[in-house]
Amino acid sequence: MRQIILILFLLFFTKTTFSEDQYLVSYTLVKSHTKKSISELWKKHKIPKVILPVKNDVDIYEVIYKAKWIDSTWITCSGIYYVPKIKKAAPYMMFGHGTQIQKQRDVSDGDAQQGICLGFATDGYIACYPDYYGIGKGEGRHLYQHSWSEAMSFVYMLYAVDELNKKINIKNNGQLFLTGYSQGGHASFAAQKYFEAINDSRFKVTATSPMSGAYDMTGEQEKYMFQKYPKPFYLPYLLTSYQIAYNVLPDTKNIYTIFKSPFDTLLPYFFEKNLSRSFEDLDKLMPPIPKDIVKDYLVDMYQNDTTFLFKKKLAENNLTNWKPKAPVQFCYCKGDREVNYKNSEVAYNTMKSIGVTKIKLNNLSDHLDHNTCAAFAVMATKFYFDRFKKHGDNPKMKDVPKFKKALANIIKKKEEKKYKESHHDHARF
């Protein structure tokens, strides 16, 4: 009997689409939130409704869609789609999540990043949470800090949900907002670059707010390769990802042979078909200086060989020297020791120097670190997007209503005080 009920449930709630859909493979309604249940979540997590208003019930779908892999073959990817129950047309908001090395991704009310999408959705945004290639229920291997595949996870998911909207009677108002935190900052900014290059009239970027991302890969972020760093996992993640994407070491058949023992045999457990091991698990096993796990000849090549393909490809994935058309706000905190805050400053200053005018630099705190900065970056992003949502592409108004800004500052001061008293910045030195 239970098996029959399960089959009926899957048939009712999971819809496999047919040939008229070019990108959408399937969609499943996984959860429905009422305003009451969202209010209870906000109360549990001490989220002020004046900062994130609760205005609409929200349906949450898991979406499977088609995307092109690096060799131009088609693979499937996944994502979460947050749909407010409203009749009027609404803007898209796409959120790029932070770094993960494990494939598994659940739909969970306890996930803070998914909560951001729920918060936008209940306030009238149609929110997308694309899994990067190889994460969630998607095929392929995740390519860390790889601009093209990050961006394409955004692009193809948007194509897919545009097809889905016709089935669930949802309309977009023509606005598209892009944001994300940490790797998601890099991913959302890469998505803007590619959306604007594709120039599809259906999906014009309205504004972007990348948060605490590593945009200057061969500049500010590169320095961490050679010094004590709280997240040393990033270097082998980059090397193994870029070997797949670009074959940066063409004479190396097994990329793991470039790592010193025991990492040559340890790393595959984290980067190959890893369902649940986190980068925090890996960091506990690594030396504090990232380059110390790589064989010396490779470090020497990076430092002295100007033709070294790995460094060239890192430079290609910098996001500092191009001209975005839609307005951009960089959010960051100067206390960030995981993603050097100067990434944002370098991107801003470089773009200003080449004539970009619709660009803003927003330092949220001189003290908060990478983790504690996130909530305030999200607040600033929400305030920034709300201007455009309410007033159109060129809003002539102050960024934030005074009372909201005052409340956000009160919350920030409390967090900074708690952070200072803890004498802990999540770094492992």
PLM region spans:
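Short alpha-helix in the alpha/beta-hydrolase fold that links the catalytic acid
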Residues: 191, 326-327, 340-351
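C-terminal catalytic histidine-bearing segment of alpha/beta-hydrolase fold enzymes
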Residues: 222, 306-313, 338, 345-346, ...
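Accessory cap/linker subdomain of secreted extracellular hydrolases
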Residues: 211-321
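Alpha/beta-hydrolase active-site loop
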Residues: 144-166
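Gly/Ser-rich "nucleophile elbow"/oxyanion-hole loop immediately N-terminal to the catalytic nucleophile
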Residues: 85-86, 159-179, 198-203
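Short, surface-exposed "cap/lid" segments of acyl-processing enzymes
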Residues: 70-78, 84-119, 137
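Short beta-strand/loop motif that positions the catalytic acidic residue
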Residues: 329-336
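Catalytic-loop region of hydrolases
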Residues: 19-88
